[in-house]
């Protein structure tokens, strides 16, 4: 697979075209950011950890019948993925209250949410990724009703798989965000699943093992990511 031009550079990943028009190479960088890019830092090993963590999770999801853009890892920091026409919203499921929902609704962090909540957010850093609903998505033509329904179904299917996976590793899946896109008429899970895009707590101590360590200046960010992987039986190459 020949790596060609850089197509896009985000806050923590770069995407490149290849000699196959249906495939892209996704490079996970060590760059880390929070608060819509206002806080930034490069953390050694993070790109490699997130790439390999994402690969392991995507394989678990594919095995559970969830369609994903992930194809295979190419190196410690690169993966081959299908080229999706991305739907410009994030799907967020919350099993436990933390982060923005606590500020918006005045609820205490740690409140168990039964059933889990589901929210859509528009992907737009300049606007602060505002929360939107099905009607916004329909009115602005971001996705069809059928695509919205599929995104919801797949997002909760991911929850069923990963809640138990992390629980088996002694962790609570607090919340997470997913992105989807279209590939030849099919809705596929895109982007990544790593501790950058979810909240994970130790089941007993409730120690934070995710990007909140960076947001809140707790330190040990990559070490926490590695600990999560270790609990799930992952090994990392650098």
From Swiss-Prot:
It is an enzyme of class 6 (ligase). Disulfide bonds: none annotated. Keywords: ATP-binding, Ligase, Nucleotide-binding, Purine biosynthesis. One of its GO terms (cellular component) is cytosol. Pfam families: SAICAR_synt. InterPro entries: SAICAR_synt/ADE2_N, SAICAR_synt_PurC, SAICAR_synth, SAICAR_synthetase, SAICAR_synthetase_CS. Pathway: Purine metabolism; IMP biosynthesis via de novo pathway; 5-amino-1-(5-phospho-D-ribosyl)imidazole-4-carboxamide from 5-amino-1-(5-phospho-D-ribosyl)imidazole-4-carboxylate: step 1/2. It catalyses: 5-amino-1-(5-phospho-D-ribosyl)imidazole-4-carboxylate + L-aspartate + ATP = (2S)-2-[5-amino-1-(5-phospho-beta-D-ribosyl)imidazole-4-carboxamido]succinate + ADP + phosphate + 2 H(+). Its EC number is 6.3.2.6. GO terms for molecular function: ATP binding; phosphoribosylaminoimidazolesuccinocarboxamide synthase activity. One of its GO terms (biological process) is 'de novo' IMP biosynthetic process. Belongs to the SAICAR synthetase family. HAMAP family: SAICAR_synth (MF_00137). This is Phosphoribosylaminoimidazole-succinocarboxamide synthase. It comes from Alcanivorax borkumensis (strain ATCC 700651 / DSM 11573 / NCIMB 13689 / SK2). The gene is purC.
